Structure formats: C-alpha cells, structure tokens
Amino acid sequence: MKQYAIQPATLEFNAEGTPVSRDFDDVYFSNDNGLEETRYVFLGGNRLAERFPVHSHPLFIVAESGFGTGLNFLTLWQAFNNFRSEHPQATLQRLHFVSFEKFPLTRDDLALTHQHWPELAPWAEQLQAQWPLPLAGCHRLLLDQGRVTLDLWFGDINELTDQLDATLNQKVDAWFLDGFAPAKNPDMWTPNLFNTMARLARPGATLATFTSAGFVRRGLQEAGFTMQKRKGFGRKREMLCGVMERCLTPTISAPWFYRSGSEKRETAIIGGGIASALLSLALLRRGWQVTLYCADDKPARGASGNQQGALYPLLSKHDAAINRFFPTAFTFARRLYDALPVSFDHDWCGVTQLGWDEKSQQKIARMLSLALPAGLASALNAEETTQAVGVTTRCGGITYPAGGWLCPEQLTRAVIALATEQGLQTRFRHTLTSLAAQKSQWQLRFASGEAASHDTVVLANGHQINRFDQTQPLPVYAVGGQVSHIPTTPALSALRQVLCYDGYLTPQNPNNRQHCIGASYHRGNESTVWREEDQRQNRQRLLDCFPDADWAKEVDVSDNSARCGVRCATRDHLPMVGNVPDYHATLTHYADLADNKASAVPAPVYPGLFMLGALGSRGLCSAPLCAEILAAQMSNEPIPLDASTLAALNPNRLWVRKLLKGKAVK
C-alpha cells in the first residue's frame, strides 16, 4: 500500500435525485426505491431475519464488496437494532460489518445522500460523525456504544483482499456482493474476488447479489459456493443467492507471523497505564472477564502519568510500516477519545512539527512527499506557521490539524474507572514476580506471596515487560525521561498549538496555567529521580532551535517542577502487540527458515500469553488501536490492519526477519 491518500468519489445527481458516479457512469442505488431494494436483495437474500434469532455466536460478521453511500450498512444496522430490541436475551449481541471502497464519498456528499432516507437518520448521523479521512487501509469505527463495528477498507478490493491477515479466514457469516454493475466496473468482478469471498466465508455462510450475470454465478460456483437464482427486485428479473456448503482449508502465507487467539473469555492484565486501561475496555465490550493487576497504589503512576502529552502520528522518511500504522492509529485514537464517556483535560488544537534547520527541513520534506490527506498532515511556510501556532518561529513545517494534547494521567484513571463500572476487577499493590503455565491456565505469583490462576494473561506493564522468563529475550529497552512543568506568561500564553522541534512545548492547560516542555532521553536508564541537568536541557533545546524568539526566553524551569518517567521502546519504533513468542522454540523451529519457508509451522508462542508493549513516546497515538487489535485477536475476531503491518507489530518480528535471511539471532 504505497499510496496513502485515496481519491474521493466524484458524484452528480440525476433527475430523480439519485447519486451517480462520474467514474463509472452508474447509480449508487435504485432510482425506484433503493432502501427497499437493499432490504430485499441483501437482508432477504441472506435470510438475516431468520438467522439472527438462532445465531449461536455473540457476533455476526457481514462483509461487503462496495460501501458506496452506506445504504446497505445503515439498513442492516437498523434491522439489527430492531432485532436487539425484540430479542434482548438472544445469544447474538454484536454486529461486525467489513466493507471495501475504492472511491469513498466525501462527508458532505455522504450527508447529502443520506437525506434520501429520513428513517435511517439516527444511524446515518453516527456514521457521518465518524466518517474517516480518505486514507488507504482499514478504518475501524465503533458505533452504537460498541455494539456495531464497521471496518471500512479504502482502496481497490482486489488489491486489499490479497493483503488481509489470515485471521479473517472463515469468519464471514454473510456476504453482500454489491458495487457498480459488472458491465460498468468489470475490474471488480474477478475470480480473485470470488475466491477471496470463499476463503473468508465460514461453513454455512451465505451471499446475495443484485446481478444474475452468468460469469458471476459460475465464478462463485467455482470458488466453492452453491448458487441459485431468485426473483429480482422490482423490474429486475433475477438475482443470485449462495451458500458456502464446503469447508475450505485456506493456506497461511506467512505462518511465522500467524496470530492465535483464545476460545476462553477470562484474562488477567498486568499493567496500570493507558494500554492496559484501553485493553480492559476493549475486552469487556466483547464479554470478557478481566482482572487488572497493578504494582502501584493507583493507575497511571508510570509513563502514563504525565500532565500533558501530544497526540499526533509518527511519520518516517523511509519506513513504510510506520507510515501505514501511525496515521491509521492516530485517526482511530481521535475517534475513540472523542467517543469515550469520560472527562479529561485535552485540546485538539493542532500540532505543528517545525523545520528549524536544514536536517529537520529535509526530514519534513520527505514526510510531506507521502501526500497524506490534508486533514491529516499538510505543509506550512513560515508565515502560515506563525498564524497557526500564535508565536513567531521564523520557519515552516508540517502541521497535523486534528492533533493536540491531552492529560494522560486523567485519561488513564477515567478509563479504568469506566471499565470498573463495566465489570473490571482491579488489584493494586500487586507486583508480579513470575508466571508459569499450569495445565490449561497461567499461575501468577506476586511479591506479597499471593498467587492467582487465570485462563489467559496479557503483559502491558511498560518497561518491566521483559522481567519474566518468557519475555526476557525480547529486544526492547527502557528509556528514562523528564518532562518540565513551566508557568505560563503573557508571551507563552499566545501559543495555540503543540510545537515539536528538537523537543516539544504544549500550550498552557487553562485549568492549571502550566505548559509542559520536554523531554529528556536516557536509553537504558530506569531512574525516575529528578535531574537538574535535564531541567536545564529541556529549556536549552528550545532556545537552540529558536535563538531569536523572545517568547522562548520566557520559559522558566527554575521552580524545578517536573515529572520523570520510563518508557519501553524498540529500535524500529513500532509497538509489540500479540502472542508472546517462545524465543528458544522460534530459533529451533526456524533454524532453516530461509531455505524451508514452504514447510514452516505456525509461529511458536506461549499459548494464552499475550503482550501489548513497547509503545515508546507515542503511546497516546498507538495504544487505542493496539488495544483494539489485541482484543480482536484474543477474541478470534477480524483485526483492523493489513497483514504486512500486523507483521511489523508482531513481537517476534526482529528475530524472524533475521531468520528469513539466514542470519543468526543474537
């Protein structure tokens, strides 16, 4: 996915007021009655009204080949909402909709189109509020208080399906095969698409499509579906329905990065910061029993305890995985933070990263060459920067208009309080000293001498994540740092955005009239002792970058107010999310991986042991999506990332990359 920005759809409206694609010269829905056609073709064709009450799983997964205006999704959501009202005790509790769209509508066009269906307004307004930027890849939207999940994959469906992770295989309960007519858009209706539909369909899955074209019917039959014709809607004579009656065995293309989940729904999370807080919520939403063990007397005592933290995506001049992951993580984080029913200090004031010297200017130029959507990142010259940030910098940069700052300490504690209301059990002053697999559970031992047993365990305890026998070989390291708290002044109070340079400076928090400036960096140092030199350096870096700025000289660190914390990082600047890998088994099983990829077994891991760590300095950006990824993996649900980006987050990646090249792992 080298292309990051997606071209939005170009629309016009015909005499009936129906939107028409200029790209394909075809209507988005029937001129007669698009809503009733959707109900007939897709809901009726998949027999959803019959299947929902007898569905034996808490989640029903629908996949769709063209999102368009969202009519199919909104109609299904309305029907699912009615089903839940009429059957509150049913096993089926949640709906997951996966859809692909090459040319997404703009938010304005979406809202205009939705005016056709006033009865769908309650659901359409929620969709419009979370409508993502035209950015390639998967956008996960959590709707209806988490009861409905929408995965919007922006891009060409036949390219995207090749990039789907193997964990989506045999998960789909029903397919909506939609899109522009085969005669108008032949590139979509391919054997590759039909085979992908079969690969993702679970045994017994159904499909429905408005077309009755012979090559479509034959292609789906060859892929494994049993097909039949059904009377079409309105003036259309026929449509197609199908059932996956076979049990296919899809191959796993990269077993060394395979992710396994759990059939159980009980876990212990070790941590107390933002990662463990958000993971608790994500698992509780899926019906898990969750116990949180925290070594401290309250949450957010570690790296998540700062007063202000900047929220913006990390971009790289050369690493494609970073450029795929962080923009997606950032947009998901904004949607999640905005939807949380909790209060915490924050201001989405924007973040501007400055090019204060030649090296930083070259770096920013390479970041801008990614051509990300303007709503995510765009260039500023020196004059525009001054207007945006409120102070004179005499340099331009790259701005993130949807970024800003928040209080990690307040957020973490508020999320854990919310999770506690939803059933989270908390155990503070519990320092985990060891864990061992015992039969089908994990035995935990704490410094107090206490012990506990749990079906699964998640390690989300920051820089202490490699303190155990199972995790000691992980290539992670601690980074100590100090953030200085400074009082505002008339000149500093003019700062309207977070400034990033060879450090960062936040606007004042109006609730305490303080700014945060930082942060020092001490790799391999776990000390949380205040340092006078760090305090001085935090100020000096600002002055070095902007020697002529009078406002910068007003930064006063003399009252020695600061906070010291320790982060956990990796050398490739990406988190580690997934199963805890078995280091020794990995080296043994994959000793000849470079020459025997075809016979490789799935990645050796510790069953039931997971991790969410190495978030580095961008935990506020990455933690929400990482928590969602891990909760989905543990629950055997669709994961909202492509396979190559997921591989770049796999805790075993640094070892496996060497083994794939025939190199020794040190």
From Swiss-Prot:
Keyword Methyltransferase: yes
Region (FAD-dependent cmnm(5)s(2)U34 oxidoreductase): 270-666
Gene Ontology CC terms, in alphabetical order: cytoplasm
Catalytic activity annotation: 5-aminomethyl-2-thiouridine(34) in tRNA + S-adenosyl-L-methionine = 5-methylaminomethyl-2-thiouridine(34) in tRNA + S-adenosyl-L-homocysteine + H(+)
Biological-process GO terms, alphabetical: methylation; tRNA wobble uridine modification
Cofactor: FAD
Keyword RNA-binding carried by entry: no
Keywords attached to this entry: Cytoplasm, FAD, Flavoprotein, Methyltransferase, Multifunctional enzyme, Oxidoreductase, S-adenosyl-L-methionine, Transferase, tRNA processing
Pfam families, alphabetized: DAO, Methyltransf_30
Transmembrane segments: none
Signal peptide extent: none
Region feature tRNA (mnm(5)s(2)U34)-methyltransferase, mapped onto this chain: 1-245
Compartments, record wording: Cytoplasm
One MF term in the entry's GO annotations: tRNA (5-methylaminomethyl-2-thiouridylate)(34)-methyltransferase activity
UniProt EC number: 2.1.1.61, 1.5.-.-
Tree of life domain: Bacteria
InterPro entries recorded: FAD-dep_OxRdtase, FAD/NAD-bd_sf, MnmC-like_methylTransf, SAM-dependent_MTases_sf, tRNA_MAMT_biosynth_bifunc_MnmC, tRNA_MNMC2, tRNA_S-uridine_synth_MnmC_C
Family: In the N-terminal section; belongs to the methyltransferase superfamily. tRNA (mnm(5)s(2)U34)-methyltransferase family.
PANTHER family according to UniProt: SARCOSINE DEHYDROGENASE-RELATED, TRNA 5-METHYLAMINOMETHYL-2-THIOURIDINE BIOSYNTHESIS BIFUNCTIONAL PROTEIN MNMC
Known function: Catalyzes the last two steps in the biosynthesis of 5-methylaminomethyl-2-thiouridine (mnm(5)s(2)U) at the wobble position (U34) in tRNA. Catalyzes the FAD-dependent demodification of cmnm(5)s(2)U34 to nm(5)s(2)U34, followed by the transfer of a methyl group from S-adenosyl-L-methionine to nm(5)s(2)U34, to form mnm(5)s(2)U34.
Protein name according to UniProt: tRNA 5-methylaminomethyl-2-thiouridine biosynthesis bifunctional protein MnmC
Native source species: Salmonella arizonae (strain ATCC BAA-731 / CDC346-86 / RSK2980)
Gene name, Swiss-Prot/TrEMBL: mnmC
